[in-house]
Amino acid sequence: MALTQGTKRKVCYYYDGDVGNYYYGQGHPMKPHRIRMTHNLLLNYGLYRKMEIYRPHKANAEEMTKYHSDDYIKFLRSIRPDNMSEYSKQMQRFNVGEDCPVFDGLFEFCQLSAGGSVASAVKLNKQQTDIAVNWAGGLHHAKKSEASGFCYVNDIVLAILELLKYHQRVLYIDIDIHHGDGVEEAFYTTDRVMTVSFHKYGEYFPGTGDLRDIGAGKGKYYAVNYPLRDGIDDESYEAIFKPVISKVMETFQPSAVVLQCGSDSLSGDRLGCFNLTIKGHAKCVEFVKSFNLPMLMLGGGGYTIRNVARCWTYETAVALDTEIPNELPYNDYFEYFGPDFKLHISPSNMTNQNTNEYLEKIKQRLFENLRMLPHAPGVQMQPIPEDAVQEDSGDEEEEDPEKRISIRNSDKRISCDEEFSDSEDEGEGGRKNVANFKKAKRVKTEEEKEEEEKKDEKEEEKAKEEKAEPKGVKEETKST
């Protein structure tokens, strides 16, 4: 596949001003506020002038149950901090309560995250954009009927299902430090989605993503896992990422790509143990973009929030083929970026435990697996189902789409200033990075496998039954 450097491409960006108001709770490392910080920084860099900015619709239960089970979504809709005691059994069943707490507005937060990713996929399908960006998405650990690793609804799976209506083969790439287990599991038995994950492996959450996990049934060899050790740096990462992705592109020949840009793989992340700089991380974005495929860019992990905002702002600029200065512009959160107030970060002096021999050995094993694939699976033509997001449908949503949570009314969702600081004691609480092997599920039940095979069929049937969906996303005013 030919590479073309520096081609200007149309970019659509999804953001809702309310997303930063949601709050996982005292001491929890996941802070949706980082998305507001990112948005504010890229506004002050003037990047909004170069792309179309949309406010996503709130994904409804019908959209979510294209993948998730009905009872799980019903539970997420119903549970609140004030009625938790009535749901203790279900909380256990759906893995909600510790790493994935119940917080005020939980379901709305999931609706915004999923809404942005699904709307992005529809935009790409309609060829109304070349690149779509949703930094509130990328929640790759959520399972069909279970929350996991701070993720409740798997917006990535929902977006890929949408892309599959128009694209025979979709490639998913994950550069978060944690294995993209939820996405891999959803597409483990299909040859229409290839999942490629580069992640820390061994005594680390979620405990999956072994080199030998390659997919099953029709999906055998369509799951690609690159297990890594602590301390990988820019040079080593680039030396594995580029050849693996080139080989995947050549062999799988996708017509659309989804890139999960989890920024917990950066140096100095509160939960991470890699040593990438923002430039090193963004080289992955640049390389994937160079294949000139319809591309969906999503967020994900990232727990040193000043660096998350830096990273995703820079990667938005990369998507736009725009150079931005290292000197940060003044913005609403300027004090977070001290003492240097610069965009780029330096690597630490941590040891890179990934030797060249180790990386080469893994790479060769992956290449052997990729050689087992038939070149570009055959295309099966089917009627195209309806889009999930209907633009100008004429039907109003039950809720006024312009109704917003005012900052004043949502004070209880926002923590005190110290909560958002990146202080030294941040290692306490939050997701346990030591793998819980009891929960690290690899073997699927026969029932799940059957469900997976019926997914395309079910997808088509549901689409025919669908009523008109909520009105299309609206362009956001630039003043947000």
From Swiss-Prot:
In Swiss-Prot or TrEMBL terms, this protein is called: Histone deacetylase 1
Q: Which organism is it from?
A: Gallus gallus
- Composition bias type Acidic residues, residue spans: 388-400, 417-427
Q: Which GO terms describe its biological process?
A: chromatin organization; circadian regulation of gene expression; DNA methylation-dependent constitutive heterochromatin formation; embryonic digit morphogenesis; endoderm development; epidermal cell differentiation; eyelid development in camera-type eye; fungiform papilla formation
Q: Which GO terms describe its cellular component?
A: cytoplasm; cytosol; heterochromatin; histone deacetylase complex; neuronal cell body; nucleus; NuRD complex; Sin3-type complex
Enzymatic reactions: N(6)-acetyl-L-lysyl-[histone] + H2O = L-lysyl-[histone] + acetate; N(6)-acetyl-L-lysyl-[protein] + H2O = L-lysyl-[protein] + acetate; N(6)-(2E)-butenoyl-L-lysyl-[protein] + H2O = (2E)-2-butenoate + L-lysyl-[protein]; N(6)-[(S)-lactoyl]-L-lysyl-[protein] + H2O = (S)-lactate + L-lysyl-[protein]
Cellular compartment(s): Nucleus
Keyword Transcription regulation listed: yes
Its family remark reads: Belongs to the histone deacetylase family. HD type 1 subfamily.
